């Protein structure tokens, strides 16, 4: 539960704390290819989650999907807004942090429920 609730967000948090403030012009320059990579993560994470028969793996792949949505939002505002556009940057950061927090709570609760079901039934499929 700790892995999905906290550790999976560390890369995105590091991006927000290091890359965004130090390299805003470069981020604006490379935002379009990064947008495509994030969109690929959204699509591939969703399809990988749909193919799973194990519930824990399904939640893990949907976590990849949700974190790709966060990256997609950040790269979209980096592509659309200039680095000096304070209102768009604050809105994107606030929305991304809220999504990260909500995903941490919901994914942890889902893994807790899956563990309970596994204990009660003995199977995850």
Annotate each PLM feature.
Residues 1-125:
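Hydrophobic transmembrane alpha-helices and their helix-loop junctions in integral membrane proteins
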């Amino acid at each position: 539960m700790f892995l999905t609730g906290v550790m999976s967000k560390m890369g995105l948090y590091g991006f927000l704390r290091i890359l965004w403030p130090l390299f805003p012009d470069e981020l604006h320059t490379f935002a379009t290819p990064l947008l495509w990579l994030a969109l690929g993560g959204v699509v591939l994470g969703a399809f990988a989650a749909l193919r799973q028969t194990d519930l824990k793996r399904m939640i893990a792949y949907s976590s990849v999907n949700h974190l790709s949505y966060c990256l997609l939002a950040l790269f979209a505002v980096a592509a659309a807004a200039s680095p000096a556009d304070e209102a768009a940057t604050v809105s994107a950061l606030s929305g991304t942090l809220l999504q990260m927090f909500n995903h941490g709570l919901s994914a942890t609760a889902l893994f807790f429920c899956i563990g309970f079901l596994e204990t009660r039934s003995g199977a995850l499929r």
